[in-house]
Amino acid sequence: MMLFVDVGNTAMKWRYRDGDVIHQGGGRHEREWSRVVELMLRSLVGMPSEIWVASVAGPEADETIAYYLKEAIRCEPHFYYSCQSDFGVESCYPEPRKLGVDRWVAMIEGFQRYGASIIIDCGSALTIDAVDSRGTFLGGYIVPGLGMLRGALLRDTSDVHIEPGMAQLGLGRSTGECVHNGLLRMSVAFVTEVVLELRQVLDDTCKVLVTGGDAPELIGAFTFEFLHAPDLVLDGLERVAARQQ
């Protein structure tokens, strides 16, 4: 059995493959990595013989995760990191290792599936990356995600208190609606402008792939054509692992 783990800044997501069967594992929004590893292993039916990890949580977190995995099941995890080129994708970063591996494997998967592609990852940060038909990573954007924007607004304003709710693009009629709707509109406007601009550089029929935990909040407001690919990072990580078989 093979276990695939996507470690973000504030969460961990996983799934596993047993033979030809893929099992959707789960996810956890917290940074107490020892606890998350324990919960992840409890969720599995059986124990993995191979573990692959794509992590942007930093060296200390990676060491912690590796330690608890080895302690629990005596299995040394494979950490995959961004590099200059792989699977036909060429990085434009002067220091390729500094590119978040979640973005990197998502671009690899997008390019391997569709060629030229625009990858939108709606996580704690909202990222947009572009790969052309030759596999060249053209560059990208990183801005705060919806949760980070809400947190910053609430932290720096004493009289704004909002309850969780569904956002829409229309005018808000309460402080909470004004916050939710305004942040949604701002994020959607940014993404839409970038997508339209990139489609003038790339083939205007290139695929737009949307992933990340906040994607369900955003995609209902997109007016451009896209594909929702919630497991894009894990798909890319599994592609990397399959090469080693």
UniProtKB/Swiss-Prot annotation:
Annotated cofactor note: A monovalent cation. Ammonium or potassium.
EC number: 2.7.1.33
Metal-binding found in the keyword field: yes
Active site per database record: 102 (proton acceptor)
Database matches in Pfam families: Pan_kinase (PF03309)
GO CC annotation: cytoplasm
Subcellular location: Cytoplasm
UniProt keywords, alphabetically: ATP-binding, Coenzyme A biosynthesis, Cytoplasm, Kinase, Metal-binding, Nucleotide-binding, Potassium, Transferase
CDD domains referenced in this protein's UniProt entry, alphabetically: ASKHA_NBD_PanK-III
Swiss-Prot/TrEMBL catalytic activity: (R)-pantothenate + ATP = (R)-4'-phosphopantothenate + ADP + H(+)
Any one GO MF annotation of this record: pantothenate kinase activity
Cofactor(s) listed in the protein's UniProt record: NH4(+); K(+)
Residue numbers binding substrate: 93, 100-103, 175
Pathway: Cofactor biosynthesis; coenzyme A biosynthesis; CoA from (R)-pantothenate: step 1/5
Subunit structure: Homodimer.
HAMAP family xref list: Pantothen_kinase_3 (MF_01274)
Family the entry assigns: Belongs to the type III pantothenate kinase family.
Name of the protein in question: Type III pantothenate kinase
Species of origin: Alcanivorax borkumensis (strain ATCC 700651 / DSM 11573 / NCIMB 13689 / SK2)
Gene name linked to the record: coaX
